[in-house]
Amino acid sequence: TRISYAYDIRIFFQFLLEQNPAFRDWSIDAFTVDVLDQITAVDLEEYEEYLKVYQAGDKTETNGERGLKRKMSSLRSFYAYYFKREMIHTNPTVLVDVPKIHQKSIIRLEADEVALLLDYIEHGGDDLTGQKKVYYEKNKDRDLALVTLLLGTGVRVSECVGLDIEDVDFKNNGIKVTRKGGNEMVVYFGPEVEKALKNYLEVRKNIIPVEGHEHALFYSTQRKRIGVQAVENLVKKYARQVTTTKKITPHKLRSTYGTALYQETGDIYLVADVLGHKDVNTTKKHYAALDDSRRRQAATAVKLRED
């Protein structure tokens, strides 16, 4: 946005005031376009280093790869504007590489962890007593249906909480979701999701919803449509009992589904379609490591000589 862009450029001039001896006695409103011609590629490299950790008033600001890339890209656009209009004679930003963003490996649950997670939601409260037991039993079927649906379809958490009861079609075992951009799509589910949903719907019949929330598929404990944050919290709560080394969120359950589907089918276009990615390159980028694994398998799949 324009505000973010202006903020990024202001940080650059703040850096010049604080770190560059040539501008130490200046004020920020003293800068004119000609100053840009005095800046060198070395200055910009120092600015990039500065951005990693710097003081902004009483706060310490930090930038990771994405933050660095955005701020350096903003500066490059700023210079390009004046250079193209011949208001400056040099453009040192083209001599400095824009920071690369390294893809993080996909965090997902392994097959045994998926089974443990669902088992824990289903039976984790068996040893509880008192009020904790009551609370667990009250939400168990809903939570199991929610997590099973996320794991079994790969829908986004926003799509999940937006579901109405009318969106569920047991005749064809599909749910109608509204994707990013407002497009509607039917996502199909298997027997495990069907069973979990039907069990929850039996419990749901006994809930009297708050007015205006009658159509919501999943209710909160306040008898309203459950929110994204509530689902985030319950997924994290259960996942902590299964793994302490992975930070599992609803989005990681989506990654778990996408990974399982790709490993099962090897069809990146199918995965992209089911996950609702408009651009298959988005899917390829996320599952590149899995592609590498398949390519390694291909290396030994063809024998040149029989043993």
Regions found by a protein language model. Give the residues of each.
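Conserved catalytic core of the tyrosine transesterase superfamily
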Residues: 1-307
